[in-house]
Amino acid sequence: LGNLGFMHPLRSSGKRLLASLATGVFALSATNAAPAQPPSGTNQTWTTQQDHRNMMEQLGITKLRPGRNGSANATNNPANYDPAKANPFPNLPELLVTKDGRKVTTAEMWWKVRRPEIVEDFEREVIGRVPKNVPKVTWAITNEARDRAVTNIPVYARQLVGKVDNSAFPSIEVNIQMTVVTPLHAKQPVPLLMMFGGFGGGGFPRRPDEPEPTNRFRGFGNLTFADPPSTEQLIAAGWGYATISPNSIQADNGAGLTKGIIGLVNKGQPRKPEDWGSLRAWAWGAARGLDYLETDPTVNAKKVGIEGVSRYGKAALVTLAFEPRFAVALVASSGEGGAKLHRRNFGEAVENLTGSGEYHWMAGNFIKYGAAESKFGSRNAGDLPVDAHQLIALCAPRPTFISYGIPEKGDANWLDQQGSYMATVAAGPAFRLLGARNLGVTEDYRTAQKPPVNTGLLDGELAWRQHDGGHESRSNMKHFIAWANKLIRYTTPAPTNP
């Protein structure tokens, strides 16, 4: 599962968390305090644990509750998988009630009052703020080919680098890696799905005379799927695709927070509590990729979607919520920090995201909600001013497809498919308010039960489908394409002979 973006709680939280499990808390003491910060103009180099402790010190936190242990036989702080114990905070933050108690009854009130309130809470407490001084990105094609094919369909493929201006702090370089592939003989600009992550060679297709690799994942044998790769399904449907490398934007660890785009903007210094985390940085990078696509004559930039699986599913949801130019999203197996309700006690918990293994995804302030002891006392998921249903609602009225697989194939209960379904249901009123369609089921998230596997709720702009595959999105890709085509008003062209 690690190869697919799923990080086991014990592995993800590292040695520090393993030690803390024995006592039930993460303790900050004089012996493990963060080192002094370097002079301004010097690039800070810390370990993940040192950076994590520094943020705890900034927030005045002395002890954190440990993350849950997702192992089936765990005896130390095991994750809960009992539905009867899953809802300690049954009431979610109000979606359509303003902070001063007014009901939101019009689209204008949503856009001018309630939505900005929700955005502010997410930026301050959960995912962080994009700085105003982020430098510009200049894109250049480094490799291109018109002699490639995807499932025997000729394509135009190009690899690009988006160089971020680092003139203000030359010691940090950020070069965003992206591959763009579109049908070579398309008669008009095509819709395109941008996908976080890479596919072998970064999504760059083979020449027709090159053999297909027989083993996509080393050490796992020849994996078989019921469906072709997502890239093949997209090209066959007349779409284009792009793959964008998250790690070329921002590293997926706490030690990288003084590097990458976050470190560049901060000139090598550690984050402040409201600064952005990796999820927001990856979303920013996707938006810069869209900047390029708006200049590409083969792409219909009004019909560009965003996709991701696992942590990149979280990033895809954040991207659609905060970048209005994206038209649609496929949010796959996103779990805690994505479509899963923070307030659910099932599988992964807020405390896993506040530990040293995953805190870098979030704003520093998010760590407060795992605090056992601090200058402000203790806080938990029930103290968060927002929850996942509101993050999904920020995508409205644009088409938003929430996707999961099944535990038997590797999409573990750890992800809490039911809790994610409840969040999707609870987001429905915002879609309806804005003239879009919800899931077409009850909007009472407290009693909502997810439909059977392979039963899609795909009639509206808000969609849900749990496929019978694993920790991936390809098993839902054909359903996503058919659903998206209707909503963006695109018809797959008939095959043509060039």
Regions of interest found by a model, annotated:
Residues G219, I261, V265, Q269, ...:
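Mobile cap/lid helix-loop segments that gate and shape the active-site cleft of serine hydrolases
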Residues V190-T298, G335-N345:
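Cap/lid segment of the alpha/beta-hydrolase catalytic domain
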Residues T298-S310:
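Alpha/beta-hydrolase fold nucleophile elbow
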